[in-house]
């Protein structure tokens, strides 16, 4: 893709977040967890489908790959919204360090997308210090927006601190929820691997 695949990761992430957000909204309106998740899945698919059709009227055109990533993100969102044991263990997040564009949803040059495995969700003993840690695996692309830079794609693995657990235990539940979707830059150690062109 013209963004090194970061735009596809962005589609997956955005549809995932939409599904999770609509699940919460529908539960707030009185639906049970399973019904709310199902309705959120269909809402996310409908909205991302409409957006993709809108792209068809623009110079971007309709992208089958975007649609696949929208479906995948919505399905992952549904799984995590309706299965507590999965949600305790996994997060999909975006790490964003503001840069040239004002829109973090299309500024792929300054974004990273990752899966976080939360060790406290693996039924560790309450006294184990490992419960405060997370394992990360992610992807990002650089240079695709700047003709003076070489295009680069990266995968990485890392170790992070479960900040949402810290905030939740400190009574900051709203902030803890936000950090299930957003990775604060500089809060993990990473081993980076550049993919061949």
Predicted segments, located by residue:
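Hydrophobic alpha-helical membrane segments
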Residues: 1-197
